[in-house]
Structure formats: C-alpha cells, structure tokens
C-alpha cells in the first residue's frame, strides 16, 4: 500500500531520544513569536511570561508533537543565536534563518563587537579564544537542555571572552550615562538661570531703594523751598506793615 503525505504526517515520530526536537516550521514560528516581543522590548531580554506566550504560540501552530515549554523555547533561541554567530563569520551564509536573525540581533551584535574591540585595545592582557562552534545542523543540536542559564553573550565574534549580558548592559550603561550627563547639564543650566534671576531681583531692589531715597530727598528739598518762600513772603508783608505804620506816625 502506498503511503500518502497525509499518512506520513500522521505517522511521523520524533527522533529516538530527542523530545526537544525542532522542525524548521516550528523553528520559524518560534523566531517570529520571539522576534515580535524582542523588538517590542527594544531588543531586551524577555520575561518569563513572555516566554510562556512564545511557547503557546509555537504549540498552537504545531501541536502534533509534544508541547514545547518556555524553557525549551529559550534554549532553542540561545542555540539559534550561537548558530547565527557562526554563520555571520562566514563570507556567505545559506542558512534559511540567517536573514531574519540578522534583522533581529544584527544591530545588537554590531554594538557589542565595537565594545569588545575597544575593550581589547584598552586591555591587552585579555586571553584570546576562538568562537564557540555549535555544529552545522540545527535539528540535531544536543545542547538545548543544557543551556537553561546560558545567554547569547558567552563569546564575542572577535575572539575575546566577554562577560554574560555584556551587550545589553553596555547599551543600557551608555544610555544611562548619557541621560545622567544630560540631567546634570540641565541642572547646571537651571542653577545658572536661578543665580542670574537672583542677581536681577537684587539689582531691582537696590534700584528701587535708590529711587525712593532720591524721591524722598527731592520731596525734602521741595518742602524746604516752600517753607523758605513762605518765610520770605511773611518777612515782606511784615516790612510793608512797618513801613505803613511809620508813615502814619
């Protein structure tokens, strides 16, 4: 009896001893589900509930085999990242997932490579090591269950050992330093404006005091002049009265 494709699909079994086996279709679904959340998080690390959503997306599209767990999905992504590093070092890659992963993690890899080279130039005592190879086959990887705590930063593309989480931390640190410098500059600018405004107010107060003193002085002078004029008028009237009295006598 001839076996139809439908019969083959129904009778398909996982490779012996490989409960974590991934097909290309399941891997493609995993990359899309993970990539959407990865980009939405500004290319940051996914949280546990994010990984559960990724696993649900994979299982809903490929539920024929054993359901994938969030840990298996994370380990698979770690393996894909290692494979991407290996393919990235080649002059030309024919790997079917290379373009998609290059779009997702390529920008982060470029920033990390620049940081690694700069660190190597500043620290010549770093021990050079070769990039870790993960083999040419993705479907037959044996490291999926051994990488629970392994991140994509265990080795740099330039052959120098890099601390875990270095890429994201370097980016976050540089952004944090830039924001701190900006905040300090704004604070200094505000303090300068405050000092200028304080001096301006002090000058206005001093000018108002001087204006009031001048006005007071002018008022006193006016009062004195009026009093002197009044006194002169009184003297003139008194002199006329005396003159008139002398004539009568």
Swiss-Prot record:
The scientific name of the source species is: Arabidopsis thaliana (Mouse-ear cress)
Polar residues compositional bias: what residue ranges? 122-137
The entry summarizes the disruption phenotype as follows: Abnormal general transcriptome profiling. Reduced ethylene sensitivity.
Biased composition, Acidic residues: where in the chain?
138-156
Keyword terms, alphabetized: Chromatin regulator, Coiled coil, DNA-binding, Ethylene signaling pathway, Nucleus, Transcription, Transcription regulation
Which range is the signal sequence, renumbered to this chain?
none
Classification via Gene3D superfamilies: Homeodomain-like
Pfam families, A to Z: Myb_DNA-bind_4
What biological processes does GO assign it? Answer: epigenetic regulation of gene expression; ethylene-activated signaling pathway; regulation of DNA-templated transcription; regulation of gene expression
Q: How does it assemble?
A: Interacts with RBL. Interacts with the Agrobacterium tumefaciens virulence protein F (VirF) in the nucleus. Binds to EIN2 and EIN3 C-terminal regions in the presence of ethylene to facilitate their association with histone. Binds to histones in chromatin specific regions associated with ethylene regulated loci. Binds to the promoter region of genes influenced by ethylene. Interacts with SRT1 and SRT2; this interaction is enhanced in the presence of ethylene.
Which ranges does the entry annotate as DNA-binding region? Answer: 22-109
Q: Where is this region: Disordered?
A: 121-157
Chief localisation class: nucleus
Q: Which gene encodes it?
A: ENAP1
User: What GO MF annotations does this protein's record show?
Assistant: chromatin binding; DNA binding; DNA-binding transcription factor activity; histone binding
Q: Where in the cell?
A: Nucleus; Nucleus, Nucleoplasm
Protein name (Swiss-Prot/TrEMBL):
Trihelix transcription factor ENAP1
Q: Name one GO cellular component term.
A: nucleus
């Amino acid at each position: 009896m001839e076996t139809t494709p439908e019969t083959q699909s129904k009778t398909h079994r996982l490779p012996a001893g490989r409960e974590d086996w991934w097909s290309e279709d399941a891997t493609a679904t995993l990359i899309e589900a993970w990539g959407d959340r990865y980009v939405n998080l500004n290319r940051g690390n996914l949280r546990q509930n994010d990984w559960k959503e990724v696993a649900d997306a994979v299982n809903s599209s490929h539920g024929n085999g054993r359901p994938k767990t969030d840990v298996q999905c994370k380990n698979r992504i770690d393996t894909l990242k290692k494979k991407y590093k290996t393919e990235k070092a080649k002059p030309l890659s024919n790997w079917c997932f290379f373009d998609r992963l290059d779009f997702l993690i390529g920008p982060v890899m470029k920033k990390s490579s620049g940081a690694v080279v700069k660190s190597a130039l500043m620290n010549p005592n770093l021990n050079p090591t070769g990039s870790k190879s993960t083999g040419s086959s993705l479907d037959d990887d044996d490291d999926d269950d051994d990488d629970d705590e392994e991140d994509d930063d265990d080795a740099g593309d330039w052959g120098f050992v890099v601390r875990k989480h270095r890429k994201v931390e370097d980016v976050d640190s540089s952004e944090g330093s830039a924001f701190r410098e900006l905040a300090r500059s704004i604070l200094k600018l505000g303090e300068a404006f405050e000092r200028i405004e304080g001096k301006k107010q002090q000058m206005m107060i001093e000018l108002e005091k001087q204006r009031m003193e001048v006005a007071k002085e002018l008022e006193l002078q006016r009062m004195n002049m009026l009093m002197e004029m009044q006194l002169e008028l009184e003297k003139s009237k008194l002199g006329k009265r005396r003159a008139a009295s002398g004539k009568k006598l």
